[in-house]
Design a protein with these regions (language model features):
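Amphipathic helix/helix-loop-helix segment enriched in hydrophobic residues with interspersed Lys/Arg
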Residues: 1-181
């Protein structure tokens, strides 16, 4: 092999190692990848209109259709960019996955936004989680009360995202099966 061939091979290998694949594969796009996500601007606009009218929005679609990517790279950046003009651009997004303990997981997701929560000793964090979980379970307005307490004194909008919402149905079936046994 000549020196020229080696040089070309080294150049090609170095070029390949610097290539960046803009597609995340099967995982959803993250907020930091918004610049790679495009083509659903019309859907983002429609979602913002529906959210501003009803304060609730369900994003439905088949598994793998891009619901999470749409949320993280379409809707959330639009909200933070002030596209829902009456609400402003000051938003915090609390993301929770139901898993096997939906209320407890939601409480944990909410507490991430409580000032100084992470500085508390483990025992005090557990007490806080128990209190928030109890308030969430206490009434249909439990979530509203918890968010008011977390945001006390702040002028901030809160978007609560329940990602993988369908897990709630699996959880309720599992809970029903366990109570039958």
């Amino acid at each position: 092999m000549s020196d020229k061939t080696l040089d070309k091979k080294e150049i090609i290998e170095s070029d390949i190692s610097e290539l960046f694949n803009p597609f995340p594969g099967l995982r959803p796009f993250g907020v930091e990848e918004t610049y790679l996500f495009f083509g659903r601007e019309g859907q983002s606009d429609d979602a913002l209109v529906k959210l501003s009218k009803g304060r609730f929005l369900a994003i439905l679609g088949a598994s793998g259709s891009g619901k999470s990517s749409f949320m993280y790279c379409g809707l959330i950046p639009s909200l933070q960019g002030g596209m829902m003009t009456k609400a402003g651009s000051n938003w915090q997004t609390m993301v929770s996955r139901p898993g096997s303990g939906p209320i407890d997981n939601l409480a944990e997701s909410i507490l991430k936004y409580k000032k100084d929560y992470h500085n508390l000793p483990q025992k005090d964090q557990q007490i806080e989680r128990t209190i928030v979980s109890t308030v969430l379970r206490s009434s249909s307005l439990g979530l509203v009360e918890v968010i008011k307490q977390i945001n006390k004194g702040q002028k901030i909008n809160t978007l609560i995202v329940i990602d993988q919402f369908e897990e709630l149905f699996r959880f309720s079936k599992l809970e029903a099966k366990n109570s039958d046994e």
